[in-house]
């Protein structure tokens, strides 16, 4: 105990005589310091007891107090994490105390509001730094004059002062932005070409089933139809495993499934051998009013029995053939 008392006495003498008041500080931090100090004192006392070969049972109250302090310190830790942001903010504010104190207060009391506004504008970003810096020689268009910079800054200051008065937020006008009005067409990849390039023009060996060997899976199909077939297989598998019927397919899905079966023969897809110059989607596009009127007039001439050109007769024949296929 004498050694402990001497060490404490020397530590007290090393401390400054006038200690700063902590009434305006964070109470949680002060409490943590007090708890840590008490915990260290109790722990040092028990170490001395252990050195004297005494039992802890004689100092049971000190052990209980030590456990209580340990629990309180652990309970403070989550609270300290919550106020960590506020503590860091206060520390940064204390570090900037000298910078803030260097700004002189206005002498007249009537200009307090204007001084506060000017103090806010003191920390605004430098708008001249937002200009693009080109690597090449500076041209007359890229060089910003000092008069323009001052006019821009004055306009921004007026805008900020106006928004501060009426309470309406107005974004800073740093640079004019033009919105793109033109719609860009999306390039849709051709799956047939991709499959041809990846399979036929590649030198990498591939394992392909023989003709007619996988009829249950509809044989070899193109990449575009493979996804539709996979969806149909999953649908059938779900119905068979759950003993239930799913809702009927929509007209769009039925049309896709028929399109898959259209060029299927013997478990193989022969659509590449029957490609027309004009695709079905291209031929089914809606014509303009003048084209439809001409076709209607030509069709009426043929039905009336009047003479028509071979081109008109061929058009009417193809139209009738197309209608019969739809039936």
UniProtKB/Swiss-Prot annotation:
One of its GO terms (biological process) is maturation of SSU-rRNA from tricistronic rRNA transcript (SSU-rRNA, 5.8S rRNA, LSU-rRNA). The modification Phosphoserine is found at residues 153-154, 309. The keyword Phosphoprotein applies. PANTHER family: NEUROGUIDIN, SOMETHING ABOUT SILENCING PROTEIN 10-RELATED. It holds the Pfam family Sas10_Utp3. Residues 127-170, 298-327 are annotated as: Disordered. The keyword Phosphoprotein applies. One of its GO terms (molecular function) is RNA binding. InterPro entries: Sas10/Utp3/C1D. Residues 317-327 have a biased composition (Basic residues). This is Uncharacterized protein C18B11.06. One of its GO terms (cellular component) is sno(s)RNA-containing ribonucleoprotein complex. Keywords: Phosphoprotein.
